[in-house]
Amino acid sequence: MGNDKTNMFVAIGLSLLVLLGWQYFVAGPRMEQQRQIEAQNKAAQQQPPGVTPDGVPSPSPKEGGPAAPAPGTLPTAQGGPVSREAALARSPRVRIETPALSGSIALKGGRVDDVSLKNYHETIDPKSPEIVLFSPAGTETPYYAEFGWVGANAGPLPTNDTLWTSDGKTLSPGMPVTLTWDNGAGLVFKRIIAVDDKYMFTIRDEVENKGSGAITLYPYSLVSRWGKPHTQGYYVLHEGMIGYLGNDGLQEFTYDKLAKEGAYGGANTKGKAWTGVTGGFVGITDKYWAAAAIPDQDTPYTGAFTDRTDGATNVYQASVRGDAVNLAAGASATATQRLFAGAKEVNVINNYEKDLGIKHFDLMIDWGWFFFITKPMFRALDFFYHLFGNFGVSILVVTFCLKLLFLPIANRSYVSMAKMKAVQPEMAAIRERYKDDRMKQQQATMELYKKEKINPVAGCWPVLIQIPVFFALYKVLFITIEMRHAPFFGWIRDLAAPDPTSIVNLFGLLPFPAPDFVHLGVWPIIMGITMFVQMKMNPAPPDPVQAQIFTFMPIVFTFMLGSFPAGLVIYWAWNNTLSVIQQYVIMRRNGVKVELWDNLRSTFRRGNGTKAAATKS
């Protein structure tokens, strides 16, 4: 095979390694730095409106409204954090029971502060604890949603210490509950809470002014999280504050980025607000779970992200505050908002966007810049999953379909490679004839390519096509909850996690765990073997250095993919296998000898010769 072709293959392999490293070590940090610079520049040009000490945007002076009191404060737990059970026992509660959720609403404060996901567990063991999303104040990591009204001239308003009464003991789909509180000064508050069979709460706050004077109130809702959680994104997906704020579009702030924002409102508080927003949502997102405050999609509001330092703890908050509601004596007002608290299931998120009209709610799932590849990839995998009932089988079928889709391109590539093999004797003669003149050798080679209608870089297309598919599948496996704990066959019980076996302990035969830094399971080894076989379908490069690179490349990729999700490794091994079969058929059809076995024999013969030489010396 000619030097041009071998050089190109070497470049492709090394480029893939460089691309992976560049994405992780350079592109991610550079993008984060650029976002911070843009945020700082924009903050310098715009003075944000005031906020309460807890991050709920208070009316700015230009609105002519009063300063707002401080909702959302957390009572300090005497003696430090307490157990979850002890914290839950501090308040009477309304139980939450749905097909997807369990938990409770605290009547003291009227918060949704106890939510567990019934269909998701911490590990692949179905008996392991359920995922806990919300936890009440007083625990080690409080995380809750709060709703209500703020205002300065309205007298006592509901706070986190307000004890509400409830007309029911259990909140379930089709069975809402109504919370009531009378402030004793002419205002009666009602909160009607409903929930569907998935993860959406609907909260309707009503207030009736039985007093003699007019008042002005502002409805608000917020999601508050105490303490910085462990993030898993590694620049592959966003975790932290997220929102779609009307014309300002998608806004994403990592926890570290939010801490670098300018001072915002109250003491020890940093953050950013957007005023005059219509449509969208604000919230806090993890890899698989999220909580979002969703205002009425047709009513203007102010959205904000804040980071308040409370001693040694950071309090992260995403909040919305509606415009002023002027309430005359004898009048009443209603504010309806929603709360999403649950798993980021693709179809559920999309249905909420469509059925409830939540603008761009699908952005809650981070499909990345190449969403136009990632989304169709997930759709295809999901379609075949519902057909076969196994995401691993779905990966195999989608890979096969992609092979069929790109069959014309691959055929042209392999036909060109077959022709190139057929002219190997002529190319060898050219190298011998012009061995002292590199330029003439290249000119004669290109004339031969032109005469035989050979494209010297045609063999690159199968590899180039595989790269975007590889990254799209990696993204899908990493971000979508549907892939979490999705089993294959045998020992693969989670396609989104690395192969749990390891060659270090002989795949579990030896009684000790394998170290993480040498994680090399069965499937990465299978992938390495298929890659080795695929490379041996072609003759070895004449350059000894290039031949060594080609020999060690499968080994490098085997170790590199050892810590990658098993689903990705299975895809690569299956794709290599299909490529070998396809190349074999095309070569035989074009009358070209398949040199696989000859190349394998020569490889091991060289290895034995090297050992023999070393022994003699």
Swiss-Prot record:
Gene3D superfamilies: 2.70.98.90. Belongs to the OXA1/ALB3/YidC family. Type 1 subfamily. This is Membrane protein insertase YidC. Interacts with the Sec translocase complex via SecD. Specifically interacts with transmembrane segments of nascent integral membrane proteins during membrane integration. Its main location: membrane. It is a multi-pass membrane protein. It comes from Methylobacterium radiotolerans (strain ATCC 27329 / DSM 1819 / JCM 2831 / NBRC 15690 / NCIMB 10815 / 0-1). The chain crosses the membrane at residues 8-28, 387-407, 461-481, 517-533, 549-569. GO terms for biological process: protein insertion into membrane; protein transport. It holds the Pfam family YidC_periplas. Required for the insertion and/or proper folding and/or complex formation of integral membrane proteins into the membrane. Involved in integration of membrane proteins that insert both dependently and independently of the Sec translocase complex, as well as at least some lipoproteins. Aids folding of multispanning membrane proteins. The lineage of its organism: Bacteria, Pseudomonadati, Pseudomonadota, Alphaproteobacteria, Hyphomicrobiales. GO terms for molecular function: membrane insertase activity. PANTHER family: CYTOCHROME C OXIDASE ASSEMBLY PROTEIN COX18, MITOCHONDRIAL, OXA1. GO terms for cellular component: plasma membrane. Residues 36-49 have a biased composition (Polar residues). InterPro entries: Membr_insert_YidC, Membr_insert_YidC_N, YidC/ALB3/OXA1/COX18, YidC/Oxa/ALB_C, YidC_ALB_C, YidC_periplasmic_sf. Coiled coil: none annotated. Residues 36-91 are annotated as: Disordered.
